[in-house]
Amino acid sequence: SEGAGETRVMSGLSSRGRRWRRALGRAPWSAGVLALMVAACLAAPWLAPYDPIEQPDTVAGKLRPPGTEMHAVALARGGWMLADRVERTPGGLRIHRAGRWQTLEAEQVTNLTPSGVADRRLYRLGSDGFSRDILSRWLYGGRLSMTIGLLAMVISCGLGVGIGALAAMGGRVLDTVLMRLVEALQTVPFFMVLSALRALLPTGPGTLILILGLSGWTTMARITRSEVLSLRERDFVLAARGLCLSETRIFLRHVLPNALTPLLVYATLVVGYLISAEAALSFLGLGVPVPQASWGNMIE
């Protein structure tokens, strides 16, 4: 009957929905959190409350816990003093900082008000050992770390795809030479290669992108070679050869589009790996130079 048919259709749809929900699990929530983090880091100039390298008061403002709010005293000579408490006096200001009281004359302060000072500083996630705001450094550092990871991935994947395709399409001799080179490079520990290149080249994010990109292409080359070797004898490729198309055109028009799925999967995985490598190098003092913020030198 029609009612029974509709029931079976609805049952099939609901069971299919349950299967999708079980397969996905918490993936949508994880993707949402990741997208939120990426968006926050990209919007760092608008979301960060302070300059990530500003050190307002390395004595009273260092290592403050999350949620700490302090009075910010603007000095006439330039710079700031951070205080836990501020009391206005007839001649100026009395502030409590670093566990003791201190008196400032009125001409030494530029942001006096009848009740104290006009400015405050709120450390939402606390401060580091140089009184820098951790939230601002996390946002700016995430933007830099993700940029380094993405650009290094582009270099790494471009080099790996090019060498892997050349090995697969260039004949037996070229394939043997390139694959032995890849295997030789893969026997060297990754961080030894990074450290050696880092010692030879100048400091800076651009150099770090180049180092990470040049040292992470070997696996992509092997994956590309494997995919191209499996595709180049397919019927559609043989038909293209029968039409006297060049090997370059066959690769770009017929082989590469069919090999993209595993290459894109690996490219997405390698971004996280390269971000972790940047963080590890910065933690060891070989990555992004201080005071520039990155996730790695924040850990340091």
Report residues per predicted region.
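Alpha-helical transmembrane segments of integral membrane proteins
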Residues: 127-300
